């Protein structure tokens, strides 16, 4: 078996990726989120597959097919709750994974980081089209509002929106193609994950200190397989607690009503994991400006490696940058809260201040803090 593990063309790849992979000896629990995201992806694909067996992508029957899954299909309620709350766990792990990358300077592995940002965008697109499928009130109006943002693109905007809708409004054609997208995208994500891992294994993992760990490495198995297994059990505990005790806590009550194109819900808001970007979108009164800010709020991650000014990789020994990082975290939580509030004072001004702070912290304050810390480290005698 040992020889097969080392010689078989397929098993050899798995062996080098998960068994004998040299890993830094000091990586903390913040390095667990990669494997947790892999687990989330597998859970989402499996539960999604079983849901797709019973779902019908038709405006007349989509809502009732979801109700049928929950009422009549064996453990359908559990599969649906795991899928809906699994998305929340996915994004929770994603945000923590990206946050870890920023804190410890993992973004300096540029290829891995850029593929990661593309992955984030793809997962966001998948979650958006998936939210439309139950065809509840918030599904319908969320799809209408967000796709309508493309009409802000000069000259081709209106044509583009109608092309995506497959008509002159969000209707049967839209639902059918969104279901097709929602089915295919997770497999594209899986392929991108393999590319992400390919680039990561070219360089090896970063570590909390940010210094080269080559002098002190240990095999991935059994040390990190057991550590990842513990993280996985904790995540599954949270997911099952959520799915079994309060499955609708993170959803919107409006989505329990079938879609009514003639009746507008009082407040349109996306799922919690999009609220920070939605708050940035709403904070700009101009439509095109809002759309550009929305895009910039995610794409800004691509320029983070270019904004690295410090001589140290990690924030572990950089208290000023650490403070700014946690201010940025608090800022994102504030934006998430604002995104769920109605468009009225004082929420408008808080959202605008938080949006400006978000871009200011990343583009200006954190690079300046890096330069200042470099200056502080230089001997003055």
Curated annotation (Swiss-Prot):
A ubiquinone binds at residue 201. It is found in: Mitochondrion inner membrane. Keywords: Electron transport, Heme, Iron, Membrane, Metal-binding, Mitochondrion, Mitochondrion inner membrane, Respiratory chain, Transmembrane, Transmembrane helix, Transport, Ubiquinone. It is a multi-pass membrane protein. Binds 2 heme b groups non-covalently. It comes from the Eukaryota. GO terms for molecular function: metal ion binding; ubiquinol-cytochrome-c reductase activity. Heme b b566 binds at residues 97, 196. The chain crosses the membrane at residues 33-53, 77-98, 113-133, 178-198, 226-246, 288-308, 320-340, 347-367. Belongs to the cytochrome b family. The cytochrome bc1 complex contains 11 subunits: 3 respiratory subunits (MT-CYB, CYC1 and UQCRFS1), 2 core proteins (UQCRC1 and UQCRC2) and 6 low-molecular weight proteins (UQCRH/QCR6, UQCRB/QCR7, UQCRQ/QCR8, UQCR10/QCR9, UQCR11/QCR10 and a cleavage product of UQCRFS1). This cytochrome bc1 complex then forms a dimer. Component of the ubiquinol-cytochrome c reductase complex (complex III or cytochrome b-c1 complex) that is part of the mitochondrial respiratory chain. The b-c1 complex mediates electron transfer from ubiquinol to cytochrome c. Contributes to the generation of a proton gradient across the mitochondrial membrane that is then used for ATP synthesis. This is Cytochrome b. It comes from Macropus giganteus (Eastern gray kangaroo). The lineage of its organism: Eukaryota, Metazoa, Chordata, Craniata, Vertebrata.
């Amino acid at each position: 078996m040992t020889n097969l593990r080392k010689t078989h063309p397929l098993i050899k790849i798995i062996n080098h990726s998960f068994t004998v992979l040299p890993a830094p000896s000091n990586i903390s629990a913040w390095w667990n989120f990669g494997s947790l995201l892999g687990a989330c992806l597998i859970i989402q694909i499996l539960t999604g597959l079983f849901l797709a067996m019973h779902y019908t992508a038709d405006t007349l029957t989509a809502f009732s097919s979801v109700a049928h899954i929950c009422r009549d299909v064996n453990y359908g309620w559990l599969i649906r709750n795991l899928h809906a709350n699994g998305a929340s766990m996915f994004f929770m792990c994603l945000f923590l994974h990206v946050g870890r990358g920023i804190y410890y300077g993992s973004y300096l592995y540029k290829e891995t980081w850029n593929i990661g940002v593309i992955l984030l965008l793809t997962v966001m697109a998948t979650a958006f089209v998936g939210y439309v499928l139950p065809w509840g009130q918030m599904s319908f109006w969320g799809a209408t509002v967000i796709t309508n943002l493309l009409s802000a693109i000069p000259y081709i905007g209106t044509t583009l929106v109608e092309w995506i809708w497959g008509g002159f409004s969000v209707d049967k054609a839209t639902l059918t193609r969104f279901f097709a997208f929602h089915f295919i995208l997770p497999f594209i994500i899986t392929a991108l994950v393999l590319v992400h891992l390919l680039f990561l294994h070219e360089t090896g993992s970063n570590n909390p200190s940010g210094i080269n760990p080559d002098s002190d490495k240990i095999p991935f198995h059994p040390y990190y397989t057991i550590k990842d297994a513990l993280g996985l059990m904790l995540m599954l505990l949270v997911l099952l607690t959520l799915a079994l005790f309060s499955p609708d806590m993170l959803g919107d009550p409006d989505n329990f009503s079938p879609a009514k194109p003639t009746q507008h819900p009082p407040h349109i808001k996306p799922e919690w994991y999009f609220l920070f970007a939605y708050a940035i979108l709403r904070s700009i009164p101009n439509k095109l400006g809002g759309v550009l800010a929305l895009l910039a709020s995610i794409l800004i991650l691509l320029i983070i490696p270019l904004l690295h000014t410090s001589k140290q990789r990690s924030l572990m020994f950089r208290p000023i940058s650490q403070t700014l990082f946690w201010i940025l975290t608090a800022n994102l939580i504030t934006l998430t809260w604002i995104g769920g509030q109605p468009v009225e004072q004082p929420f408008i001004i808080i959202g605008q201040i938080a949006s400006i702070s978000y871009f200011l912290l990343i583009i200006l304050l954190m690079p300046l803090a890096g330069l200042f810390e470099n200056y502080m480290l230089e001997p003055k005698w």
